[in-house]
């Protein structure tokens, strides 16, 4: 089974999926970005001990994508933007369509949390989040975040944080500002997720066209290869059902924290 994110909008459904996967003895892969070249190199640096014992990690994950009209454009008397209709308009030929409104934490949180899980090999125990609706009218109308920051307490005394948002297509020359900062007892590293990349500029270039293009990106191929190897050898994929469930639990805890303004324990 290969599934796109989010794993589910309910933690109970994630648990049901795990039970079904294990009962039927099948393999499950939750789609992720962990095979991007810079991320692989960062993982190798951490595993080699180059920065010593891992103490802290931070991820900036800002997608430079639009989500319909910007915040503040709805006129008095206009009806709220319908979530499903907006998703159908944006994703007519691909996935990510659902009737339940979700903020960026739920839609894209798998990616930065997937990095944190892979690089630290630790579970998140407690979170504190602040969320806002800063950019897009559809998020305002449906009461979901498009910008958030989350503080994390992990196993082994590791602390972490992430910032996530959907910040508009004209805000960045690449798909977004996505960087991972890792601090250890002997030093630190900064991983620019987009590298390697080339910049392309030409006359009369459309203003919303990404100027930077990624190269040497075999993430999709490597994910499928990893899944095929799991089927052939019996090993677990890079992000299996239990790993996906733990990430979902962290997301749900962060959403709750953003609503209550209080730290929330993550249910494992």
Feature annotation, model-predicted:
Residues 2, 27-29, 58, 128, ...:
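Structural detector of well-ordered beta-strand residues that form the stable sheet scaffold
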Residues 34-140, 261:
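Predominantly a Rossmann-like dinucleotide-binding segment in NAD(P)-dependent oxidoreductases
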Residues 14, 39, 112-113, 220-225, ...:
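A general structural signal for well-ordered alpha-helical segments in protein cores
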Residues 107-195, 221-233:
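Contiguous beta-strand/loop segments that form the cofactor/metal-binding neighborhood of enzyme cores
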Residues 13-15, 23, 229-268:
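C-terminal helix-rich "cap/oligomerization" subdomain common to oxidoreductases
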Residues 180, 196-206:
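Short polybasic amphipathic segments
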Residues 26-27, 53, 156-158:
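Short, well-ordered coil/turn segments that N-cap beta-strands
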Residues 1-34, 49:
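Beta-strand-loop-alpha-helix segment that lines the small-molecule cofactor/substrate pocket
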